[in-house]
Each structure stands twice: as structure tokens, then as C-alpha cells.
From Swiss-Prot:
It is found in: Plastid, Chloroplast stroma. This is ATP-dependent Clp protease proteolytic subunit. GO terms for cellular component: chloroplast stroma; endopeptidase Clp complex. InterPro entries: ClpP, ClpP/crotonase-like_dom_sf, ClpP/TepA, ClpP_His_AS, ClpP_Ser_AS. Component of the chloroplastic Clp protease core complex. The lineage of its organism: Eukaryota, Viridiplantae, Streptophyta, Embryophyta, Bryophyta. Disulfide bonds: none annotated.
């Protein structure tokens, strides 16, 4: 959690006195607002999954809203968040604010189709998964490379399913870092709407 997380007064129905609660851990989660505002790792993935499962059990009819500003991160952690989003009964709206790169864009695309939004100045980036395994036996490096290729194929096929572009287009685009504006991400199919600025 960020340093200096604000506290807000909250009163349970039927209670006279309000208590001061952490805005992230209580108030926003009660409103079904989730935030991915950091590098995707196992810890943040487990927190998001736990919250989604809790909210799913609490009320299967109320949608969830996942706000994303993330440079990406660990592939398996990102895939686990995506899988949880597909598992829960309520629709998960995804909203890109700032940057959704790498696994951040994968999670963004995993929102309920027609309910994926980018704020007007948001940026989205897709690319292929990378391996950090360079030091080891040749056999281990080969096994690692095979696993990365399997993950790349899985991610590519999910993008094809969620975006609607041909496999060869997604596969070619994932060869390098492809940055997109909010409008370009909409045209590409990662998001369905670009939010309009309030004036």
C-alpha cells in the first residue's frame, strides 16, 4: 500500500458514530473499486484476486471496477489476475488511467468486453513476454525458453480472442514494444471506449 494512505470517516448503517478507515482497504473496496497502481507481482496479484473472490461471494450481481496504472510485471502473476477476472460472476470493468503496459495491458484487455475504458491521455503498450533467466545450465535455459514461448502463445491467443484481430497481426505486433494512445488502443480493440473530459 502507498505511504500516507488517506483515512475517511465511515459509518455502518444503524451505528451512531463514524470510524476512520483506510480509504483503500475498506471504503473503496466496499464500493467495488479496485486499483492496480504498481508493478504486477505475486503479492499484488494475490491481493487483487482475494478481493475479487470476496466481492464475488458477497454479491454476484454488482459489477467491479479495476483501475489500472501499471508498467506491467510478472507474467504468471498477471495471468492469474486475468483468470480471476474471467472466473468471477460480476462483470469486471477495466479503466486505464496513466499507463497499462505489458501485463497491465493484458489485464486491461481482460475486462468485460464493452466495459473496457481508457482515460483520454492514457497510454497502452503491448509486447511479448521476456525471460530473466540468463545464468544457468544450457538445458535449463532451453526449458525456460520453451516455457516463455508457451506463455507468449497463450497471451497472443487471449489477445486474439479479446481484441478480434488475426493471430498473425497480434503475433507480429508483439515482436516489439507497441505504444498506443487511448484512441489508438480503442481502434486496436484493447479498450472499447475512451472517456470524455469533463469541461
Amino acid at each position: 500500500m502507498p505511504i500516507g494512505v488517506p483515512k475517511v470517516p465511515f459509518r455502518l448503517p444503524g451505528e451512531e458514530d463514524a470510524v476512520w478507515i483506510d480509504v483503500y482497504n475498506n471504503r473503496l473496496y466496499r464500493e467495488r473499486l479496485l486499483f492496480l497502481g504498481q508493478h504486477v507481482d505475486d503479492e499484488i496479484a494475490n491481493q487483487l484476486i482475494g478481493i475479487m473472490m470476496y466481492l464475488n461471494g458477497e454479491d454476484e450481481n454488482k459489477d467491479m471496477y479495476l483501475y489500472i496504472n501499471s508498467p506491467g510485471g510478472a507474467v504468471l502473476a498477471g495471468i492469474s489476475v486475468y483468470d480471476a477476472m474471467q472466473f468471477v460472476v460480476p462483470d469486471v470493468h477495466t479503466i486505464c488511467m496513466g499507463l497499462a503496459a505489458s501485463m497491465g495491458s493484458f489485464i486491461l484487455a481482460g475486462g468485460e468486453i464493452t466495459k473496457r475504458i481508457a482515460l483520454p491521455h492514457a497510454r497502452v503498450m503491448i509486447h511479448q513476454p521476456a525471460s530473466s533467466y540468463y545464468d544457468g545450465q544450457a538445458g535449463e535455459c532451453i526449458m525456460e525458453a520453451e516455457e516463455v514461448l508457451k506463455l507468449r502463445d497463450y497471451i497472443t491467443r487471449v489477445y486474439v480472442q479479446r481484441i478480434g484481430k488475426p493471430l498473425w497481426v497480434i503475433s507480429e505486433d508483439m515482436e516489439r514494444d507497441v505504444f498506443m494512445s487511448a484512441q489508438e488502443a480503442k481502434t486496436y480493440g484493447i479498450v472499447d471506449l475512451v472517456a470524455i473530459e469533463n469541461t
